Amino acid sequence: MYWTDWGSSPKIEKAEMDGSARQIIVTGNLVWPNGLTIHKATNRLFWADAKLDKIEVSDLNGRNRQLIMSSVADIHPFGLAVYHDMLYWTDWNTRGISNYNLSSGTKDTLVDGLQQPMDIHVFDPALIFSGT
């Protein structure tokens, strides 16, 4: 399992499903990390930082960290979901749901006019995880 911590030292952590083998995997250049989502096909972990207005990605151990998009793109992401080659997020600037094509790099607003969209989930029975 993976989680974020907005505490005095913001971080992303992971552990086994019984809480053992706890590890801090991402630190530094984080303030309000949230919206974790895993791209199962590529074993990559995506997250948003609601304070720094950016979306980042790393491998499942926090290595190979890369910036996907930042406030330069006029985003304020909160919740994230990934499905095939599309990254979806709730956006407080547009008050809607946007997406980003991970292959082409194109960005779109899909839904607008929401009040304060917090989270987003994709449902596809093929994406059900199994684990220990």
Residue ranges and their predicted role:
Residues 91, 98-120:
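C-terminal interaction modules of eukaryotic adaptor/scaffold proteins
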Residues 28-44, 72-86, 92, 114-131:
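Beta-rich, blade/repeat-based domains predominating
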Residues 23-27, 66-70, 108-113:
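Beta-propeller fold detector
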Residues 16-20, 59-63, 101-105:
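Short loop/turn segments that connect beta-strands within beta-propeller blades
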Residues 8-10, 52-53, 94-95:
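Short coil/turn segments within WD40 beta-propeller repeats
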Residues 6, 41, 50, 60, ...:
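Short loop/turn segments immediately following the C-termini of beta-strands
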